[in-house]
Amino acid sequence: SADSYAANTYKQIYKVVAKANNIVNFDINSLDNAAASKAEATYYVGQAYALRAQSFFDLLRLYGQKYTGGNDGIVLPVKFDPLNKQGRSSIADTEKQIEADFEAAINKMESSKSFDRPDKRSEISINAVKALAARYYLYKNNYAKVQSLVNDIVASKKYKVIEKDALVSSWEASGSA
């Protein structure tokens, strides 16, 4: 492809993983500020776990051998170590890491729920993480987990179903031509 972004998908996703790792591996206890700052940092660490989980999931779907009959997953760097020439993990290990990251994301973000700002489009909300995790579990055919996560989102009452007559107009930007 002549599209450099499409051609460099592997590299671009691993850049996200590297940046997420910097946050995930940050020692929150080294912060000098009050407990509120540590709680906010915990929330952002949760967001980083979510980004890493989604990145690993995208890499597994694009470059893992799950759907071609192989057993190779992807490379799972969870700490920065430029000298480590890490090989591919198995599909099972890759999926275990994705699930652990989604779980850590939800746990950390829910423990600092006061920092959840679903109206801020530059941040990942708790419900957005649950939706991403539900999508992952849908790929794994784990419908009980999907239902549990989706029920949590619905129970939050932050969203409503759009009436069928308003569906098309709901995609139109207000004030656009």
Segments from the language model and where they lie:
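Residue signature of alpha-solenoid helical repeat architecture, marking inter-repeat boundaries
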Residues: 43, 50, 93, 117-120, ...
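Amphipathic alpha-helical segments of tetratricopeptide repeats
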Residues: 106-107, 114, 154-156
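Conserved, well-structured interaction surfaces
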Residues: 1-63, 89, 107-110
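Short coil/turn linking the two alpha-helices of tandem helical-hairpin repeats
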Residues: 60-67, 113, 139-142
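Hydrophobic-face positions in mid-chain alpha helices that act as interaction patches
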Residues: 141, 145-177
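Residue-level signature for tetratricopeptide repeat
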Residues: 55, 134-136
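Short coil/linker segments at helix-helix boundaries
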Residues: 36-39, 62-92, 96
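Inward-facing hydrophobic residues that define packing positions of alpha-helical scaffold repeats
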Residues: 17-20, 24, 95, 102, ...
